[in-house]
Amino acid sequence: MKNNAKEDYRTFSLTTNYSRQMIYRCVTGLQIGFSLFSFIIVCVALPIMYNHVQNTITYVDREMAYCEVRFLYFYCIKFFSTLQRSNDEAALELQYGKMRMTGNRTARGAYGSGASHGFRPTAYGDEITGAPLETECPGCCIPGPPGPRGSSGTPGKPGLPGNAGKPGMPGTTPNQTCPLNQVREPPPCRPCPKGPPGIKGWPGFPGDVGPPGPPGLKGIDGEDGAPGETGPTGPPGYRGGPGAPGDKGPTPEGDLKEGPPGDEGPPGPIGAPGMPGLPGRNGLTGGQGERGWPGVSGESGEPGYPGPEGPMGGQGPPGEPGVCVCQNVDSILLINPGPQPRIRADDYNSDDGYGGSRGGGDRAGYQGYGRK
Protein backbone atom coordinates (compact mmCIF):
# COMPACT_ATOMS: atom_id res chain seq x y z
CA MET A 1 0.00 0.00 0.00
CA LYS A 2 2.80 2.38 0.85
CA ASN A 3 4.52 1.68 -2.45
CA ASN A 4 1.26 2.27 -4.32
CA ALA A 5 0.75 5.57 -2.53
CA LYS A 6 4.28 6.67 -3.36
CA GLU A 7 3.84 5.73 -6.99
CA ASP A 8 0.51 7.59 -7.12
CA TYR A 9 2.13 10.68 -5.58
CA ARG A 10 5.00 10.53 -8.05
CA THR A 11 2.60 10.15 -10.94
CA PHE A 12 0.53 13.11 -9.69
CA SER A 13 3.63 15.28 -9.23
CA LEU A 14 4.92 14.40 -12.70
CA THR A 15 1.53 15.19 -14.21
CA THR A 16 1.38 18.53 -12.38
CA ASN A 17 4.90 19.50 -13.45
CA TYR A 18 4.15 18.54 -17.03
CA SER A 19 0.99 20.68 -17.06
CA ARG A 20 2.92 23.63 -15.62
CA GLN A 21 5.62 23.22 -18.22
CA MET A 22 3.02 23.20 -20.96
CA ILE A 23 1.43 26.39 -19.59
CA TYR A 24 4.81 28.12 -19.33
CA ARG A 25 5.68 27.04 -22.85
CA CYS A 26 2.41 28.43 -24.18
CA VAL A 27 2.92 31.76 -22.39
CA THR A 28 6.52 31.99 -23.63
CA GLY A 29 5.47 31.18 -27.17
CA LEU A 30 2.75 33.86 -27.09
CA GLN A 31 5.19 36.46 -25.80
CA ILE A 32 7.72 35.62 -28.50
CA GLY A 33 4.98 35.74 -31.15
CA PHE A 34 3.70 39.16 -30.02
CA SER A 35 7.25 40.50 -29.89
CA LEU A 36 7.99 39.31 -33.43
CA PHE A 37 4.68 40.69 -34.67
CA SER A 38 5.38 44.10 -33.10
CA PHE A 39 8.89 44.13 -34.55
CA ILE A 40 7.58 43.30 -38.02
CA ILE A 41 4.94 46.06 -37.77
CA VAL A 42 7.60 48.59 -36.76
CA CYS A 43 9.92 47.50 -39.57
CA VAL A 44 7.12 47.88 -42.11
CA ALA A 45 5.51 51.06 -40.73
CA LEU A 46 8.66 53.15 -40.31
CA PRO A 47 9.73 53.01 -43.99
CA ILE A 48 6.16 53.74 -45.09
CA MET A 49 5.94 56.77 -42.79
CA TYR A 50 9.36 58.00 -43.88
CA ASN A 51 8.42 57.60 -47.56
CA HIS A 52 5.15 59.48 -47.01
CA VAL A 53 6.88 62.35 -45.21
CA GLN A 54 9.59 62.51 -47.87
CA ASN A 55 7.01 62.59 -50.65
CA THR A 56 5.13 65.37 -48.86
CA ILE A 57 8.30 67.43 -48.44
CA THR A 58 9.25 66.89 -52.09
CA TYR A 59 5.77 67.92 -53.24
CA VAL A 60 5.85 71.09 -51.13
CA ASP A 61 9.35 71.95 -52.42
CA ARG A 62 8.19 71.51 -56.01
CA GLU A 63 5.14 73.71 -55.45
CA MET A 64 7.24 76.41 -53.82
CA ALA A 65 9.79 76.29 -56.63
CA TYR A 66 6.98 76.50 -59.20
CA CYS A 67 5.49 79.53 -57.45
CA GLU A 68 8.87 81.24 -57.25
CA VAL A 69 9.62 80.58 -60.92
CA ARG A 70 6.18 81.83 -61.92
CA PHE A 71 6.61 84.94 -59.77
CA LEU A 72 10.02 85.69 -61.27
CA TYR A 73 8.80 85.01 -64.79
CA PHE A 74 5.86 87.39 -64.34
CA TYR A 75 8.01 90.21 -63.05
CA CYS A 76 10.69 89.61 -65.68
CA ILE A 77 8.07 90.02 -68.39
CA LYS A 78 6.91 93.25 -66.78
CA PHE A 79 10.49 94.42 -66.48
CA PHE A 80 11.31 93.78 -70.14
CA SER A 81 8.05 95.43 -71.23
CA THR A 82 9.05 98.46 -69.16
CA LEU A 83 12.42 98.64 -70.89
CA GLN A 84 10.68 99.00 -74.25
CA ARG A 85 9.16 102.33 -73.24
CA SER A 86 11.06 105.53 -73.15
CA ASN A 87 13.23 106.48 -70.23
CA ASP A 88 11.11 109.50 -69.35
CA GLU A 89 7.90 107.53 -69.25
CA ALA A 90 9.45 104.79 -67.07
CA ALA A 91 10.87 107.41 -64.71
CA LEU A 92 7.46 109.06 -64.39
CA GLU A 93 5.81 105.73 -63.72
CA LEU A 94 8.35 104.90 -61.06
CA GLN A 95 7.79 108.30 -59.44
CA TYR A 96 3.96 108.61 -59.60
CA GLY A 97 2.78 105.09 -60.36
CA LYS A 98 0.87 103.75 -63.34
CA MET A 99 -1.68 106.41 -64.16
CA ARG A 100 -2.76 108.53 -67.08
CA MET A 101 -0.46 111.52 -67.04
CA THR A 102 -1.60 115.00 -68.09
CA GLY A 103 0.74 117.62 -69.39
CA ASN A 104 3.52 118.01 -71.86
CA ARG A 105 6.11 115.26 -71.90
CA THR A 106 8.61 117.36 -73.81
CA ALA A 107 8.64 120.66 -75.55
CA ARG A 108 7.05 119.01 -78.58
CA GLY A 109 3.86 118.36 -76.66
CA ALA A 110 2.71 121.90 -77.24
CA TYR A 111 2.39 121.19 -80.96
CA GLY A 112 0.20 118.10 -80.49
CA SER A 113 2.82 115.43 -80.92
CA GLY A 114 2.43 114.16 -77.36
CA ALA A 115 -0.70 112.19 -78.17
CA SER A 116 1.26 109.41 -79.76
CA HIS A 117 2.99 108.68 -76.45
CA GLY A 118 -0.08 108.01 -74.36
CA PHE A 119 -0.54 111.49 -72.81
CA ARG A 120 -3.53 113.74 -72.96
CA PRO A 121 -2.37 117.11 -74.30
CA THR A 122 -3.24 120.16 -72.26
CA ALA A 123 -2.21 123.72 -72.15
CA TYR A 124 1.46 124.51 -71.93
CA GLY A 125 2.72 124.91 -68.39
CA ASP A 126 0.27 122.60 -66.56
CA GLU A 127 1.95 120.68 -63.75
CA ILE A 128 1.75 116.94 -63.32
CA THR A 129 0.01 116.08 -60.08
CA GLY A 130 -0.97 112.79 -58.57
CA ALA A 131 -0.31 110.51 -55.60
CA PRO A 132 2.25 107.71 -55.93
CA LEU A 133 0.52 104.45 -56.77
CA GLU A 134 1.72 100.87 -56.84
CA THR A 135 4.14 100.52 -59.70
CA GLU A 136 3.69 97.98 -62.40
CA CYS A 137 7.04 96.36 -61.62
CA PRO A 138 7.66 96.57 -57.84
CA GLY A 139 10.43 93.98 -57.96
CA CYS A 140 12.45 96.08 -60.44
CA CYS A 141 12.00 99.57 -58.96
CA ILE A 142 15.12 101.61 -58.39
CA PRO A 143 15.42 102.63 -54.74
CA GLY A 144 15.31 106.35 -54.04
CA PRO A 145 17.95 108.40 -52.27
CA PRO A 146 18.36 107.90 -48.53
CA GLY A 147 16.17 110.04 -46.30
CA PRO A 148 17.36 112.64 -43.82
CA ARG A 149 19.20 111.52 -40.76
CA GLY A 150 16.98 110.81 -37.80
CA SER A 151 17.26 112.35 -34.38
CA SER A 152 19.74 110.88 -31.96
CA GLY A 153 18.41 108.23 -29.62
CA THR A 154 18.36 108.17 -25.85
CA PRO A 155 21.84 107.74 -24.40
CA GLY A 156 22.47 104.25 -23.11
CA LYS A 157 23.20 103.30 -19.52
CA PRO A 158 26.81 103.39 -18.41
CA GLY A 159 28.52 100.04 -18.63
CA LEU A 160 29.82 98.01 -15.73
CA PRO A 161 33.33 98.82 -14.51
CA GLY A 162 35.97 96.63 -16.08
CA ASN A 163 38.26 94.26 -14.27
CA ALA A 164 41.32 95.64 -12.56
CA GLY A 165 44.38 95.65 -14.79
CA LYS A 166 47.52 93.76 -14.06
CA PRO A 167 50.32 95.61 -12.22
CA GLY A 168 52.69 97.42 -14.54
CA MET A 169 56.36 96.82 -14.97
CA PRO A 170 58.70 98.75 -12.65
CA GLY A 171 60.26 101.89 -14.05
CA THR A 172 63.82 101.98 -15.35
CA THR A 173 65.56 105.07 -13.96
CA PRO A 174 69.36 104.99 -14.29
CA ASN A 175 71.30 104.95 -11.01
CA GLN A 176 68.12 104.54 -9.02
CA THR A 177 68.59 104.04 -5.29
CA CYS A 178 66.09 102.38 -3.04
CA PRO A 179 64.62 104.55 -0.27
CA LEU A 180 65.31 103.25 3.19
CA ASN A 181 61.78 103.72 4.48
CA GLN A 182 60.01 102.35 1.45
CA VAL A 183 57.35 99.82 2.40
CA ARG A 184 57.57 96.65 0.40
CA GLU A 185 55.83 93.37 0.73
CA PRO A 186 57.94 90.83 2.58
CA PRO A 187 59.00 87.75 0.67
CA PRO A 188 56.87 84.65 1.18
CA CYS A 189 57.66 82.75 4.35
CA ARG A 190 59.11 79.34 4.21
CA PRO A 191 56.68 76.55 4.99
CA CYS A 192 56.80 75.86 8.70
CA PRO A 193 57.20 72.28 9.85
CA LYS A 194 54.12 70.45 10.97
CA GLY A 195 53.32 70.53 14.65
CA PRO A 196 53.24 67.42 16.78
CA PRO A 197 50.17 65.28 16.35
CA GLY A 198 47.32 65.87 18.75
CA ILE A 199 46.17 63.57 21.47
CA LYS A 200 44.50 60.49 20.19
CA GLY A 201 40.74 60.79 20.43
CA TRP A 202 38.44 58.53 22.31
CA PRO A 203 37.43 55.37 20.53
CA GLY A 204 34.12 55.58 18.78
CA PHE A 205 30.98 53.87 19.88
CA PRO A 206 30.66 50.26 18.84
CA GLY A 207 28.72 49.72 15.70
CA ASP A 208 25.32 48.13 15.53
CA VAL A 209 25.01 44.41 15.44
CA GLY A 210 25.19 43.20 11.91
CA PRO A 211 22.35 41.26 10.36
CA PRO A 212 22.40 37.51 10.86
CA GLY A 213 24.24 35.63 8.22
CA PRO A 214 22.51 33.35 5.78
CA PRO A 215 21.80 29.83 6.98
CA GLY A 216 24.55 27.33 6.50
CA LEU A 217 24.50 24.45 4.10
CA LYS A 218 22.47 21.41 4.93
CA GLY A 219 24.35 18.90 6.99
CA ILE A 220 24.98 15.31 5.96
CA ASP A 221 22.05 13.04 6.74
CA GLY A 222 22.57 10.60 9.55
CA GLU A 223 22.53 6.85 9.12
CA ASP A 224 19.21 5.10 8.80
CA GLY A 225 17.77 3.74 12.00
CA ALA A 226 17.34 0.00 12.67
CA PRO A 227 14.21 -1.55 11.20
CA GLY A 228 11.27 -1.66 13.57
CA GLU A 229 9.63 -4.80 14.93
CA THR A 230 7.39 -6.81 12.66
CA GLY A 231 3.75 -6.00 13.13
CA PRO A 232 1.17 -8.63 14.04
CA THR A 233 -0.20 -10.87 11.33
CA GLY A 234 -3.41 -9.65 9.86
CA PRO A 235 -6.63 -11.69 9.89
CA PRO A 236 -7.10 -14.28 7.12
CA GLY A 237 -8.84 -13.17 4.00
CA TYR A 238 -12.30 -14.11 2.89
CA ARG A 239 -12.75 -17.59 1.46
CA GLY A 240 -13.12 -17.76 -2.26
CA GLY A 241 -16.24 -19.03 -3.96
CA PRO A 242 -16.52 -22.60 -5.32
CA GLY A 243 -15.30 -23.22 -8.80
CA ALA A 244 -17.49 -24.23 -11.73
CA PRO A 245 -18.22 -27.97 -12.04
CA GLY A 246 -16.13 -29.78 -14.59
CA ASP A 247 -17.34 -31.92 -17.52
CA LYS A 248 -18.33 -35.50 -16.86
CA GLY A 249 -15.66 -37.91 -17.81
CA PRO A 250 -16.17 -41.10 -19.90
CA THR A 251 -17.63 -44.10 -18.14
CA PRO A 252 -15.05 -46.91 -18.03
CA GLU A 253 -16.05 -50.33 -19.27
CA GLY A 254 -15.93 -53.36 -17.15
CA ASP A 255 -15.92 -53.59 -13.42
CA LEU A 256 -15.16 -50.54 -11.43
CA LYS A 257 -12.26 -50.78 -9.15
CA GLU A 258 -11.20 -48.03 -6.85
CA GLY A 259 -7.71 -46.99 -7.58
CA PRO A 260 -5.22 -45.45 -5.21
CA PRO A 261 -5.75 -41.82 -4.24
CA GLY A 262 -4.37 -39.32 -6.64
CA ASP A 263 -1.69 -36.77 -6.07
CA GLU A 264 -2.49 -33.58 -4.27
CA GLY A 265 -3.82 -30.93 -6.62
CA PRO A 266 -2.17 -27.53 -7.19
CA PRO A 267 -3.10 -24.74 -4.83
CA GLY A 268 -6.06 -22.62 -5.71
CA PRO A 269 -5.86 -18.99 -6.84
CA ILE A 270 -4.95 -16.30 -4.33
CA GLY A 271 -7.93 -14.98 -2.51
CA ALA A 272 -8.92 -11.36 -2.00
CA PRO A 273 -6.47 -9.28 0.06
CA GLY A 274 -7.16 -9.26 3.74
CA MET A 275 -7.67 -6.27 5.97
CA PRO A 276 -4.54 -4.11 6.49
CA GLY A 277 -2.64 -4.86 9.63
CA LEU A 278 -1.95 -2.41 12.39
CA PRO A 279 0.90 0.03 11.75
CA GLY A 280 4.21 -1.06 13.14
CA ARG A 281 6.17 0.87 15.70
CA ASN A 282 8.58 3.58 14.69
CA GLY A 283 12.19 2.61 14.42
CA LEU A 284 14.88 3.89 16.71
CA THR A 285 15.98 7.50 16.31
CA GLY A 286 19.06 7.82 14.14
CA GLY A 287 22.24 9.46 15.29
CA GLN A 288 22.72 13.24 15.10
CA GLY A 289 24.01 14.51 11.78
CA GLU A 290 27.26 16.39 11.36
CA ARG A 291 27.40 20.09 12.12
CA GLY A 292 26.75 22.41 9.15
CA TRP A 293 29.21 24.92 7.73
CA PRO A 294 29.40 28.29 9.51
CA GLY A 295 27.37 31.12 8.00
CA VAL A 296 28.78 34.22 6.29
CA SER A 297 30.05 36.85 8.73
CA GLY A 298 27.86 39.93 9.23
CA GLU A 299 28.60 43.40 7.90
CA SER A 300 31.00 45.66 9.77
CA GLY A 301 29.56 48.27 12.11
CA GLU A 302 29.40 52.00 11.42
CA PRO A 303 32.55 54.05 12.07
CA GLY A 304 32.85 55.75 15.41
CA TYR A 305 32.62 59.49 16.07
CA PRO A 306 35.77 61.50 15.25
CA GLY A 307 38.01 62.35 18.17
CA PRO A 308 38.47 65.89 19.50
CA GLU A 309 40.76 68.27 17.64
CA GLY A 310 44.38 68.17 18.78
CA PRO A 311 46.13 71.16 20.34
CA MET A 312 47.76 73.78 18.16
CA GLY A 313 51.38 73.09 17.19
CA GLY A 314 54.30 75.10 18.46
CA GLN A 315 55.29 78.42 16.94
CA GLY A 316 57.57 78.12 13.93
CA PRO A 317 60.92 79.87 13.60
CA PRO A 318 60.92 83.58 12.66
CA GLY A 319 61.19 84.46 8.99
CA GLU A 320 64.12 86.13 7.30
CA PRO A 321 64.37 89.93 7.05
CA GLY A 322 63.19 91.58 3.87
CA VAL A 323 65.56 92.48 1.10
CA CYS A 324 65.58 95.30 -1.46
CA VAL A 325 67.21 94.70 -4.80
CA CYS A 326 68.01 97.84 -6.73
CA GLN A 327 68.14 97.84 -10.47
CA ASN A 328 71.51 98.57 -12.11
CA VAL A 329 73.17 98.37 -8.67
CA ASP A 330 75.17 95.37 -7.57
CA SER A 331 74.09 95.48 -3.95
CA ILE A 332 71.28 94.26 -1.70
CA LEU A 333 70.06 96.38 1.20
CA LEU A 334 68.50 94.82 4.28
CA ILE A 335 65.49 96.60 5.68
CA ASN A 336 65.32 96.49 9.48
CA PRO A 337 67.99 93.82 9.91
CA GLY A 338 67.48 91.72 12.99
CA PRO A 339 68.75 88.52 14.48
CA GLN A 340 69.16 86.00 11.71
CA PRO A 341 67.79 82.49 12.28
CA ARG A 342 70.23 79.69 12.17
CA ILE A 343 69.38 77.53 9.21
CA ARG A 344 71.27 74.55 8.03
CA ALA A 345 73.28 75.01 4.85
CA ASP A 346 71.63 72.09 3.05
CA ASP A 347 68.10 73.39 3.81
CA TYR A 348 69.00 76.86 2.58
CA ASN A 349 70.64 75.66 -0.62
CA SER A 350 67.74 73.33 -1.42
CA ASP A 351 65.23 76.22 -1.47
CA ASP A 352 64.99 77.77 -4.95
CA GLY A 353 63.00 80.78 -3.78
CA TYR A 354 65.84 82.37 -1.70
CA GLY A 355 69.17 82.91 -3.33
CA GLY A 356 69.13 79.59 -5.19
CA SER A 357 68.19 81.23 -8.45
CA ARG A 358 70.24 84.37 -7.81
CA GLY A 359 73.56 82.67 -7.99
CA GLY A 360 75.16 81.45 -4.85
CA GLY A 361 72.61 80.73 -2.13
CA ASP A 362 73.52 82.23 1.26
CA ARG A 363 76.75 83.75 0.09
CA ALA A 364 75.23 85.50 -2.88
CA GLY A 365 72.13 86.61 -0.93
CA TYR A 366 74.11 88.54 1.72
CA GLN A 367 77.21 89.44 -0.24
CA GLY A 368 76.47 93.11 -0.53
CA TYR A 369 75.21 93.76 3.00
CA GLY A 370 76.40 97.15 4.21
CA ARG A 371 77.80 98.14 0.82
CA LYS A 372 76.44 100.60 -1.66
UniProtKB/Swiss-Prot annotation:
Pfam families: Col_cuticle_N. Residues 197-208, 293-303 have a biased composition (Low complexity). Residues 237-246, 283-292, 353-363 have a biased composition (Gly residues). InterPro entries: Col_cuticle_N. Coiled coil: none annotated. It comes from the Eukaryota. Residues 185-196 have a biased composition (Pro residues). Residues 1-45 form the signal peptide. Changing G153E: In dpy10(SC48). GO terms for biological process: collagen and cuticulin-based cuticle development; cuticle development involved in collagen and cuticulin-based cuticle molting cycle; locomotion; post-embryonic body morphogenesis; regulation of gene expression. Keywords: Collagen, Cuticle, Disulfide bond, Repeat, Signal. Nematode cuticles are composed largely of collagen-like proteins. The cuticle functions both as an exoskeleton and as a barrier to protect the worm from its environment. PANTHER family: COLLAGEN, CUTICLE COLLAGEN DPY-10. Belongs to the cuticular collagen family. This is Cuticle collagen dpy-10. It comes from Caenorhabditis elegans. The lineage of its organism: Eukaryota, Metazoa, Ecdysozoa, Nematoda, Chromadorea.
